[in-house]
UniProtKB/Swiss-Prot annotation:
Record-linked InterPro entries: 3-IsopropMal_deHydase_ssu, Aconitase/3IPM_dehydase_swvl, AconitaseA/IPMdHydase_ssu_swvl, IPMI_Swivel, LeuD
Name of protein: 3-isopropylmalate dehydratase small subunit
Pathway(s) per entry: Amino-acid biosynthesis; L-leucine biosynthesis; L-leucine from 3-methyl-2-oxobutanoate: step 2/4
Function per UniProt: Catalyzes the isomerization between 2-isopropylmalate and 3-isopropylmalate, via the formation of 2-isopropylmaleate.
Catalytic activity, as annotated: (2R,3S)-3-isopropylmalate = (2S)-2-isopropylmalate
Length: 201
């Protein structure tokens, strides 16, 4: 079972860039691991650090600004997560501590992979995202409240409605990953197996 997602209130960091691809999110040289942990250290590695080893933080990259330390909501521009289909991208984001990404649009494969890893991708209009960027930049350290049950983001004095596919919403609200979904039908699977002839194994 995955962690349930109902509501989340968190610090917002504005990544004012469009077409952020998966190689920027987690560069290919860090993909050797097969577990989901440890990727956060290399999130946006080529942007966060001035050296290949990740020892010299880039002071001009927004994730390194003191006011955004501990951010759990990423605000981005259109076509976030484009490029190759690596599932390591949402792994890196969640391992770093992100729970939500808000953008005008997402690459399809990244969008699906996010739900598989309990990372909520929230799609809003360009105008709404523009408003959020202005709000965050004017108020560094602001926190947004994301309510998946109500499908609303509360940002400052405004509320923004978003839409999520009913099945994906159900899975996130109940903490159901592919294993959890299978276990929901455990009794039916066991009953089916009992009916099978012994020679079928």
């Amino acid at each position: 079972m995955a962690e349930k997602f109902t509501q989340h209130t968190g610090l917002v960091v504005p990544l004012d860039a469009a077409n952020v691809d998966t190689d920027a999110i987690i560069p290919k040289q860090f993909l050797q691991k097969v577990t989901r942990t440890g990727f956060g250290a290399h999130l946006f590695n080529d942007w966060r650090f001035l050296d290949d080893k990740g020892e010299q933080p880039n002071p001009e990259f927004v994730l390194n600004f003191p006011e955004y330390q501990g951010a759990s909501i990423l605000l981005a521009r259109e076509n976030f997560g484009c490029g190759s289909s690596r599932e390591h991208a949402p792994w890196a984001l969640t391992d770093y501590g992100f729970k939500v990404v808000i953008a005008p649009s997402f690459a399809d494969i990244f969008y699906g992979n996010s739900f598989n890893n309990q990372l909520l991708p929230v799609t809003l209009s360009d105008e709404e995202v523009d408003e959020m960027f202005a709000l965050v930049k004017a108020n560094p350290g602001i926190r947004f409240e994301v309510d998946l049950e109500a499908q609303v983001v509360k940002a400052g004095d405004k509320s923004y409605s978003f839409s999520i596919d009913a099945f994906r919403r159900h899975c996130m609200l109940n903490g159901l990953d592919s294993i959890g979904l299978t276990l929901q039908h455990e009794d039916a699977i066991a009953a089916y197996e009992k009916k099978q002839p012994a020679f079928m194994g």
